[in-house]
Design a protein with these regions (language model features):
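Conserved glycine-rich Rossmann-like NAD(P)H-binding loop of the short-chain dehydrogenase/reductase
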Residues: 25-40
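Active-site helix of classical SDR
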Residues: 112, 148
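Substrate-binding pocket helix/loop in short-chain dehydrogenase/reductase
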Residues: 88-89, 96-98
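The beta1-alpha1 cofactor-binding region of Rossmann-like NAD(H)/NADP(H)-dependent oxidoreductases
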Residues: 52-62, 94
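Residue(s) in the substrate-gating loop at a strand-loop-helix junction
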Residues: 132
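Conserved glycine-rich cofactor-binding loop
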Residues: 11-12
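C-terminal helical subdomain
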Residues: 172-173, 193-234, 238
Length: 239
């Protein structure tokens, strides 16, 4: 049996597509999300589905320990769980900022903390953090969200440097516009309408599986090759 893959936020969109790709390659999976029924509905073989909020580190550690007891050490963690709540700083509900930083930044740190000690001890392992083009440049209405994704880029690169001597890899995947549920949680209808119009102007956006294929490409390199970052976007996406 191939090595264990842990994926957060796997109940839809990019996380679901990544889960399907790794399952097709024969990997056992630990899938975590708040909507566990969506995970179970994927009906993937050799898969443990756990209801976990990534902001709850203890629950995440418990789920990983349970999966490792069944499938062996986690060889890869895909930190995919994320929230995108767009808005102008002067009008946006401050609770939305906190929710994004809790999930996108602290949740990511919780995931890395949960697996890194074991990876360093084994001198092997890969962490793949799903960030965004919004972690490389700014966009209107994205101030707080960009802040979280710039943090993901900084954390990923810093930790990559720290664990490189232990033969552990850290990769950042930075997608542009992707067809997922992320935008649906934004409360401003004007912002959502503008985003939808932008997607039409581009002639369409990335599919979740486009991002999943980038993840697989990075992971399937030999362990002595670390793809530090992949940025991908629709060809017609200018910013």
């Amino acid at each position: 049996m191939k090595k264990l893959v842990v994926i957060t936020g796997a109940s839809s969109g990019i996380g679901e597509a990544i889960a399907r790709r790794f399952s097709e390659e024969g990997h056992p999976l630990l899938l975590v999300a708040r909507r566990v029924e969506r995970l179970e509905a994927l009906n993937l073989p050799n898969t443990l589905c756990e209801k976990v909020d990534v902001t709850d580190q203890a629950s995440l550690i418990t789920a990983i320990e349970k999966a490792e007891a069944q499938f062996g050490p986690a060889d890869v963690l895909v930190n995919n769980a994320g929230v995108m709540l767009l808005g102008q700083i002067d009008t946006q509900d401050a609770a939305e900022w906190k929710r994004m930083f809790d999930v996108n930044v602290l949740g990511l740190l919780n995931g890395m903390h949960s697996v890194l000690a074991s990876m360093k001890a084994r001198n092997s392992g890969t962490i793949i953090n799903i960030s965004s083009i919004a972690g490389k440049k700014t966009f209107p209405d994205h101030a707080a969200y960009c802040g979280t994704k710039f943090a993901v880029h900084a954390i990923s690169e810093n930790v990559r440097e720290e664990v490189a001597a232990s033969n552990a890899r850290v990769t950042t995947i930075a997608p542009g516009a992707v067809e997922t549920e992320l935008l649906s949680h934004t409360t401003s209808q004007d912002i959502k309408d503008g985003y939808d119009a932008w997607k039409v102007d581009m002639g369409g956006v990335l599919a979740a599986d486009d991002v999943a294929r980038a993840v697989m490409f990075a992971y399937q390199q030999p362990q002595n090759v670390c793809i530090r970052e992949i940025a991908l976007a629709p060809t017609k996406q200018q910013p």
